């Protein structure tokens, strides 16, 4: 697993499969999430790169290459859902893109990848890398999942939502996995990270991350201005494709006392049972046996 910030993409192209082919999924791969990621290597990368992440400007972020095997991601792309009712299209002055958040429609390989990044080992990796503890993955992929931007598409600079209203969680981390074979920089689509609005504040700082195949971008949110402003100029039949995950923390509940080390039982006790137990603690068993025999003797009279 490489942790470099930049790498050249493989020298061959990959076009989107035809809609009709996307339905011909193979059987589910013989993999489980724990086999998809090298968890030992994950923790090594987190330990080695945590300072880089936290010190990065304009806000904490990193780009890591080679997090998955290339053939695994190729298979995921081959199983892309058809660009029909399975995709939600957004065409506004702020964005032009398609999204699909239902992992059951992704195909078996991408679904396993989704589960791998929602698993405990990957969450522990994120916590070690970012320094943010108590991270919670979102199995519902609210506003996450596949995002596809076709020629002419774009995503204006924006701040992400701060709270997942259904689960009442605070959004903390974005993870983007790019799936673009042989991507050319002149096509555009680089992820822009900004410190301030470049229009209203000339002092802003900008970092760009190319959306190369098998590259993962991770950054803090929601106070992170990001996007890709310029319309894509990639060839027809190509698109800027990525999978995304969001991670949250739970806000403290007012009035709740922390009880993390033991279960605290409350409620009525059986007085008779409690009295017998207490008596047993201070009375030798032989006394109880003698009392029983005396009681039986008097009962026979």
Protein language model features and the residues they cover:
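A structural signal for well-ordered alpha-helical scaffolds and beta->alpha junctions
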Residues: 69, 73, 110, 119-123, ...
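Eukaryotic charged/polar low-complexity linker/IDR segments
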Residues: 174-176
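Non-heme Fe(II) oxygenase catalytic core, chiefly the N-lobe of the double-stranded beta-helix
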Residues: 78-81, 105, 114-171, 180-182, ...
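A structural signal for the main folded, soluble domain(s) of proteins
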Residues: 86, 91-92, 96-103, 129-138, ...
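Non-heme Fe(II)/2-oxoglutarate
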Residues: 41, 50-130
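Histidine-centered active-site/metal-ligand motif
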Residues: 61, 158, 226
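Catalytic core of Fe(II)/2-oxoglutarate
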Residues: 2-5, 152, 166-171, 181-301
